[in-house]
Amino acid sequence: MSHKRFNPLTASSSDEDELETPIREVEDSSSDEETDSDSDSELGKKDEVVTEVSALNNQESKSVKISEKSVAKRSRETHEAQASADVKKAKKVKKRGGGGGEEAETKKAYFQRVWTDDDEIVVLEGFIDYKNDSG
């Protein structure tokens, strides 16, 4: 049975720093008697163990956060580099004919086309009709 109880010796003002220690079950009733010095030394040992464990947990969580950020940053950088390389390749087209392998830049596309040429013509004709009707 693992009950946890609040340890007032390790308490702090913030909720994040509160630590719980498991309650020790007593199996033999004949060993119920303890001297004050025995219980004090046990509390000191528990405090040391609890502080060591909490310090290790803090260090582990910091290292995990750092590694997640660096991995995400690296993947984003490589993705951006690949995208820019693809754009550069798309902008350059090899000349066909007697160019001898020279590359010429094509017209730069500033945005991705959503409509076809036919759709664009229909919309422009609609603008013209509206302008003629409304004046």
UniProtKB/Swiss-Prot annotation:
Biased composition (Basic and acidic residues): 62-80
Chain residue ranges for the region called Disordered: 1-104
UniProt keyword annotations, A-Z: Transcription, Transcription regulation
Biased composition (Acidic residues): 28-41
Family statement drawn from the similarity comment of this UniProt entry: Belongs to the GeBP family.
Protein name per UniProt: Probable transcription factor At2g20613
